[in-house]
Amino acid sequence: MLHIKNMVCPRCVMAARGILITHMDPIISKIICTMLMATACLRAAAQTDTIYKEHKLQGIEVKATNGIKSKNRVGNTEIIGQAQLFRAACCNLGESFTANPSVDVSYSDAATGARQIKLLGLSGTYVQMLTENIPNLRGAGIPYSLGYVPGPWMQSIQVSKGAASVKNGYESITGQIDIEYLKPQGTDGIRGNAYLDSNLKQEANLDGSIHLNDRLSGSLLLHGENRQRDHDGNGDGFMDMPRQKQYNVMNRWAYVSSGLISQLAIRLLGDQRSSGMSSHAANHDMRRYGVDVNTHRYEAQWKNALMLQGRPGTSIALMLHGSWHDAHYTFGDTRYNVTQKNGYAQLMYETDLDEHHNLAVGTSLNHDYYDELASGAAFASPYPAAGSHSESTIGAYAQYTYKLGEQLTVMPGLRYDHSTLYGGFVTPRLHVKYAPVSLLTLRASVGKGYRSPHALAENTPLLASGRTCIVANDLKQETAWNMGLSAALNLPIGSKTLEVNAEYYYTRFGNQLVINFDGARGDHTLFFDNLHGRSYSHTLQVDATYPLVEGLTATAAWRYNDARTTYDGQLRQRPLTSLYKGLLTLSYKTPTALWQFDVTGQLNGKGKLYDNSDYPAYGQLQAQVTREFRHFSVYLGGENLTNYRIARPIVGAENPWQPSFDATQIWGPTEGAMVYIGIRIKFETL
């Protein structure tokens, strides 16, 4: 069920897509009923199913097993399409990378269920998150952002490594993750997905779209999830996963003509999490340690592209985005509340000077307003950023592209930005793609990136401990250089092709927000400070994909990370970062395309804990079976089938009120094996 058109860039029309669904809570039942009524008048629209076929669309190759591999893009980019997302339950963005060798996803703590990603051996804060080419999910939205994007809503995920284009700003350091949502102009009808797992987590998703005429389309996307099980599988007295409720609603409109593209989206989100000591473990002689996270988020974005008539390849684009994020956290006696308001605007002009030369220039404005309140014994002194503060950054950029057929592409870019907090700074970036022969493609990139650090807003799950939190009052802007080399080889072997990719990336920080656990400030302290010394990351990865027999494709990958930072004058391996990772995936689809079987095995390497001691390597296995029918499919799967989990995920769980209590040293699974079942439904004719 993979349908792809050109993605909305200032010069072309955006893509269209299908969707999913999941849930069984009363709130979700109401959502489904509302959606069914809203879509009762939809017209039928023919849609070609290309889940089994290969197509070539403007230099992009679409494969059922491996998503979309970029052929002509100058950057090292992988596009994960719905065909690959459907190989697992993929309830949200955080569960979309289980079969991806480049991106690691792990839990941030053992209390709130927050997930974090790592790319090139570094924290997800150094990955620029985009939604449809617009910077998003920043600052206070980072800690739980991977759970804010329902998997069935996604048309594709684009993962770009290394320095990114200057068009999207200056914040990309290790790469970008760009989320493409389902588009209203794609199809008529409704689609849904329902999901239930052995931990009694329920999900429901539903979307419907309507074409009012040949230019104007609208859609409504709904998501709800509910988990209320008070489960303590390891017997430490704390819930393994939080009780959680979430609602997520998006309304989209698109106007598409030969000379104008306009897209409007409004989104509402509410997320409630409750965890801590389980009810049966509460001791009458000791207060219950509770954890609560209550979040509301609202977004709106408007994208416009005007194609200038009589000037092929020339367009003017205006992109606007605004968000309001309000979160309230409770960790025992510690309280932290944060409200972030963000406004973003970009105006861009792009033109093809001739068949070899392209020029893009533009200007952007980003404004962030924070209002923070921190209280409790966890803070040694008043949090220095408490109260309201803001930052406005205005910038301009130019990017030139030289392209010599399919053989050579050179893309230098430069932007200048001025921040009300950090003054002016320059962001240079360069990408080169060279294909000496048709079988081999070489890429190189180098560029600088910057970030404005927000110690607690971006790292809130770290408050799930008894440590005293100390934040330096002179935090500086984070800066880093990233350099990368990659090679892609497509080697014919008989009638099949072996795809081999090798890449190396090096990231070096000029300044960094260093999070020092139990360091020179004393035991049981959490100290946020500037970098005093060196900090870098080396990443080497090799992966290969080969169709073993008809319908059966295997992918094997190996990655090595060497990430080190200076703590208290000593250069040490970054804690909770595995030295290596191995991945093997097998995907088989029967000749009739009615059955699909997917298996993914991972070997996660050893690493260091906060005290510089080692944690061991461990393996994981997940599998899924999918049965296709005409208007629906049923899938049954399991995660962590090796049943491996950390024996003691929470240190000091017997007395959470003592300084040694720590729920943040999570290096592996906190839950055992889990099985799930779900159904995907698609009605294109009502």
Please state what every model-predicted region is.
Residues 47-86, 94, 124:
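Short, acidic, small-residue-rich periplasmic hinge/interaction motif at the N-terminus
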Residues 98-135:
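Extracytoplasmic beta-strand/coil segments of soluble accessory domains associated
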Residues 134-161, 249, 472:
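Short acidic/polar hinge/loop motifs at secondary-structure boundaries
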Residues 148-189:
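A beta-strand signature from Gram-negative outer-membrane beta-barrel systems
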Residues 227-248, 254-316, 322-340:
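Flexible loop and strand-edge segments within Gram-negative outer membrane beta-barrel domains
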Residues 315-329, 435, 443, 476-530, ...:
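Membrane-embedded beta-barrel scaffold of Gram-negative outer-membrane proteins
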Residues 406, 500, 504-509, 529-609, ...:
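Gram-negative outer-membrane beta-barrel transporters
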Residues 554, 606, 627-686:
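C-terminal beta-signal and adjacent terminal beta-strands/loops
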